[in-house]
Amino acid sequence: MPRRREVAKRVILPDPKFNDRVVAKLVSVIMLDGKKSTAERALYGALDIVSQKAGEEPVKVLKKCLDNIKPMLGVKSRRVGGSTYQVPVEVRADRRVSLAMRWLVRYANERSEKTITDKLAGEILDAYNNRGAAVKKREDTHRMAEANRAFAHYRW
């Protein structure tokens, strides 16, 4: 947290194939060891599979899938006296998107399909249909926030 001035947000350039910033950001989340072309190949392959199976525009399906994963509420630890409370807080808009992308990639990697392309396509389609591990993670996060609603007055 800088003391002097607000740090400017970096502008992410849209990806070359779909000309979309969300796809470009997801490529960055998928990327390991700076291998961007490998990450692009995996995501573009997954989006091709998604467009075949869903019969819709792949970017539209991806955005709907991310909307289904985005958490509205979360919990933050807050120490009061000698005990730590899980205080429910609303998640900021930019954090919602980044959490959704991280969860999508994380739970896609845990799937049993053989290639990362198939794993990503499967998780995207599951999230699009409100199923899958990433959507379950969002539901668990919301349930945790709801369970700790009694501590909402500790919000800061």
UniProtKB/Swiss-Prot annotation:
Entry keyword Ribonucleoprotein: yes
GO biological process, one term: ribosomal small subunit assembly
Coiled-coil stretches noted in the UniProt entry, renumbered to this chain: none
SUPFAM superfamilies: Ribosomal protein S7 (SSF47973)
One of the Pfam families matching this protein, by short name: Ribosomal_S7
InterPro entries, per the entry: Ribosomal_uS7, Ribosomal_uS7_bac/org-type, Ribosomal_uS7_dom, Ribosomal_uS7_dom_sf
GO cellular component term of the entry, any: ribosome
Record keywords: Ribonucleoprotein, Ribosomal protein, RNA-binding, rRNA-binding, tRNA-binding
A molecular function GO annotation: tRNA binding
Family: Belongs to the universal ribosomal protein uS7 family.
Assembly, per entry: Part of the 30S ribosomal subunit. Contacts proteins S9 and S11.
NCBIfam families according to UniProt: rpsG_bact (TIGR01029)
Protein name: Small ribosomal subunit protein uS7
